[in-house]
Amino acid sequence: MEVYELNFFKRLRKSISVSGGGSKKPKTDTEAINSLSSAYVALETKLNLKSTGRSAILIKRAAVAEFDEMKYEIERFLEAGKADFDLTYRTIVDPYDYLWIIIVSKTIEDNVAAIISIGETIEQKGFSDKLLASIFDFNDGNIAQYLIYNYKLDKFYPFVPVNEQQKRRNHGDELKIMSAIADELPFEKELSKWYPIWNIPV
């Protein structure tokens, strides 16, 4: 299993480098997230937003042995890929009992490949209904700004927290992000569905 997953990661990373993503009407979560591998260029050129190399996938835990086994397989797969892809990872369970798998890598392409690989493993193991969101961290030199992929909506949306304690966000900057890349990837147009995720641990 570990060898298969690592080979899948290598093939996926190669395919992202060649294709560059950019599917505007993706049929799957994989295609949707893959589109970020080219869309991020628009964030850099238009808004000076750069990837920090940090991303995460958020999963609702299930109190069954199969879920723990799946988590162990994902950790083995990521451990095996650390040297080849120059990435690190950690897992945490937050106060709401959600599992976070946090990835740190040198390039956004490796972030995308790792998140896709984890998501597909979760789906293959029968826990697709537990997938909540993937989060990609960007920064303009001042504050963190996030792109969130919601697995229930099958779309991205921006999130720019300003004050975590007061639950304040910068809607103006979020709209700028949407304007910059709405044509580059599947984007949620309904602002009421831009659900905040506070205290993102990336």
Where are these regions (language model features)?
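Helix-rich interaction surfaces within compact, conserved domain-sized segments
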Residues: E123-P196
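Conserved short hydrophobic interaction patches
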Residues: F77, I118-K125
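Short, solvent-exposed secondary-structure capping/transition elements
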Residues: D86-L87, E109-A114, E123-L131
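Extended, folded cores of ATP/NTP-driven motor/assembly subunits in large transport
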Residues: T52-L58, V104, I108, L131
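Charge-rich, low-complexity segments
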Residues: E2-F67, R168-V202
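Short, flexible loop/turn elements at secondary-structure junctions
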Residues: A63, S105-T107, L153
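A glycine-rich, hydrophobic loop/mini-helix early in the fold
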Residues: A42-Y98
